[in-house]
């Protein structure tokens, strides 16, 4: 559980939101801070992309899927593992989806 702006936000044992509808950009900043990340424009681009992906496909992207989809939309410079790991050092798919208020990707350990 997470306390944000005086409200209890239900999370799983790893800190992923149980209800994606509770997410807001302000909450994303708080989740990112808990992960040791200060969100830059580049982080927001990935976080918003992951949310759009989830809304379209009803699943959080695993790393391979995330890299490929990012490359298709933003080009090879941003659609590669090195770029994404620089932004999300504990795992791009795991951290980006957590900050985006989405369920943990199925293939993430």
Swiss-Prot record:
Q: Does the keyword Disulfide bond apply?
A: no
Query: What NCBIfam families does the annotation carry?
Result: dsrC_tusE_dsvC, PRK11508.1
- Tell me where it resides: Cytoplasm
Could you tell me which Pfam families the record lists for this protein?
DsrC
Record family assignment: Belongs to the DsrC/TusE family.
So what does this one do?
Part of a sulfur-relay system required for 2-thiolation of 5-methylaminomethyl-2-thiouridine (mnm(5)s(2)U) at tRNA wobble positions. Could accept sulfur from TusD.
Where does the protein principally reside? cytoplasm
Q: What is its EC number?
A: 2.8.1.-
Q: Name one GO molecular function term.
A: sulfur carrier activity
Q: Entry's Gene3D superfamilies?
A: 3.30.1420.10, DsrC-like protein, C-terminal domain
The organism encoding this protein is Salmonella choleraesuis (strain SC-B67)
What InterPro entries does the record point to? Answer: DsrC-like_C (IPR042072), DsrC-like_dom_sf (IPR025526), DsrC-like_N (IPR043163), DsrC/TusE (IPR007453)
A Gene Ontology term for the protein's cellular component: cytoplasm
**Assembly behavior:** Interacts with the TusBCD complex. Interacts with MnmA.
Q: Does the keyword Cytoplasm apply?
A: yes
Q: Name its GO BP terms in alphabetical order.
A: tRNA wobble position uridine thiolation
Listed name of the protein? Sulfurtransferase TusE
The enzyme's first-digit EC class, named in words, is transferase
Q: Which UniProt keywords apply?
A: Cytoplasm, Transferase, tRNA processing
By its UniProt entry, which SUPFAM superfamilies does this protein fall under? DsrC, the gamma subunit of dissimilatory sulfite reductase (SSF69721)
Q: Where does the record place the catalytic residues?
A: 108
